[in-house]
Curated annotation (Swiss-Prot):
Residues 47-175 form the Thioredoxin domain. Its main location: membrane. Gene3D superfamilies: Glutaredoxin. Residues 1-29 form the signal peptide. This is Dolichyl-diphosphooligosaccharide--protein glycosyltransferase subunit MAGT1. GO terms for cellular component: endoplasmic reticulum; oligosaccharyltransferase complex; oligosaccharyltransferase complex B; plasma membrane. The gene is Magt1. Glycans are attached at residue 71. Accessory component of the STT3B-containing form of the N-oligosaccharyl transferase (OST) complex which catalyzes the transfer of a high mannose oligosaccharide from a lipid-linked oligosaccharide donor to an asparagine residue within an Asn-X-Ser/Thr consensus motif in nascent polypeptide chains. Involved in N-glycosylation of STT3B-dependent substrates. Specifically required for the glycosylation of a subset of acceptor sites that are near cysteine residues; in this function seems to act redundantly with TUSC3. It is a multi-pass membrane protein.
Amino acid sequence: MASPRWLWCVCATAAVTLLLVSKVPSASAQRKKEKVLVEKVIQLMEWTNQRPVIRMNGDKFRPLVKAPPRNYSVIVMFTALQLHRQCVVCKQADEEFQILANFWRYSSAFTNRIFFAMVDFDEGSDVFQMLNMNSAPTFINFPPKGKPKRADTYELQVRGFSAEQIARWIADRTDVNIRVIRPPNYAGPLMLGLLLAVIGGLVYLRRSNMEFLFNKTGWAFAALCFVLAMTSGQMWNHIRGPPYAHKNPHTGHVNYIHGSSQAQFVAETHIVLLFNGGVTLGMVLLCEAAASDMDIGKRRMMCIAGIGLVVLFFSWMLSIFRSKYHGYPYSFLMS
């Protein structure tokens, strides 16, 4: 009876000893992780105090942004700011990113939960290759744990690159709210006041003859300009603040038409406005050719010119529509 009891005590003692021995490396590894994490945070805080947006290359990016352990988020802007890249959008996005990072750095809510960094293609091309990136600028949130998800990549073409829009996206991904307070812009009110003053002056000078206020051609032209501006997407640009165009940093190819139906470039708005104006001018010429009292030769020329403008610009407009809505089956003259 004593032998089994003695054997049981030996087994229990061995199990406890093994458990204690196994805990020693685990605790040591945990302390090592904590030490590495503290060193990372101290380094990032030191760089942030020097410059709100930390410039990174591959040697800094891999250990501080990609490698664990991390208890902080890093908002990284991948860009191409060198002059020979000729990326105008990159410079504009960088200005907004710097504004946002400065507001965060000098706000009372500043903590070490989130850091701002940038990787320039000419300084960290290996990072671009590692992430399979072929466009700039691009904003990505690297969360404290795990890999970035699809929503952690900022939709630049949809939201634009204003500091306020990026701040809303950061709040959605990290629960960190950054207030961007800009000084008031008085250019708009001043221009409106100047326009009203000019109109008031003209009305005062022509107060004896107010027939120009009832000029149908003038009002029709003003209404047409307003309609063309609104149908081309000017209001969407005003709300979203999209880039003027997009230049691929690798190939140098500039895209003026966005490939998605969910976004557009400012240049695309100007192109659509021009095409709508061409179609409108063609319709006006056709109407004038039908109702004018001019000789038949001039009316025939106006009719041919009107048909040519409508056909040409409508075909171009339809080709743009097809390039944005890839399943659209119809085309006219141009595919």
